[in-house]
């Protein structure tokens, strides 16, 4: 990929869009990569936050035996063959009775590659709110409740943070409206936009194997990788080309993600914004030295692209990625 191609790829990723995953630049040691499968080695969960003009939150009352009678946000596991958005819409219809459309991804949570939760801000488009007369195995009922006075008992208190995240986004968007892109991927992986900045310039790490490209690192499923989370795969790739003990590495968040659950292809690719800086900066006008020949630092010269990238970095204009 020439410089024009790299600029186009970076613009695509910064715009929340996706790119085909051709291969991975870094893979876990040992066993070869194998395609991931829902219900076998990965679990994806969807959750929706709804806030109306009265500052009320859509809550559902759980019917499951282990948490029956408690309250939570509409949520559930993805099924094979679904897109992420389809799964969210199905869960909302089953648990709350409403039809809906996504507004944006609010956050992505992970416990390693085997468990990922996609949190949406959504709006209702139709349907009939589920009442206690409609109780079934999916939920007992649904209702709108003041954000400052949610029904109790809550199934789990993590909803409080997610509701506040949604309210904050409604008041002032922290990042562009971003939705999952429907592009297939066979593994759980991350496309890295790894940056190094000085007062005047910004560089992006590029993979050289094949056509120059934004590098991709595959996530592993060993106990150590599950404990460390998907950041382990980021550090693995960077360790292959940089001397990390002298550097500070920060995962800023997500620029977007892609998935297409068709033909038994259940992988997901997260586009992740990462910063690299010297621990003892002093006056550093050049990025850290690359080891080997599989990567290089690309200096972004396109003014519009440089401004956009610096804005996303300085304002942390990304989807939160948390554990």
From Swiss-Prot:
Record keyword Metal-binding present: yes
GO molecular function ontology, one term from the record: metal ion binding
EC numbers: 3.6.1.58
CDD domains according to UniProt: NUDIX_8DGDPP_Nudt18
Keyword flag Manganese: yes
Binding site for Mg(2+): 58
Protein known as: 8-oxo-dGDP phosphatase NUDT18
Native species: Mus musculus
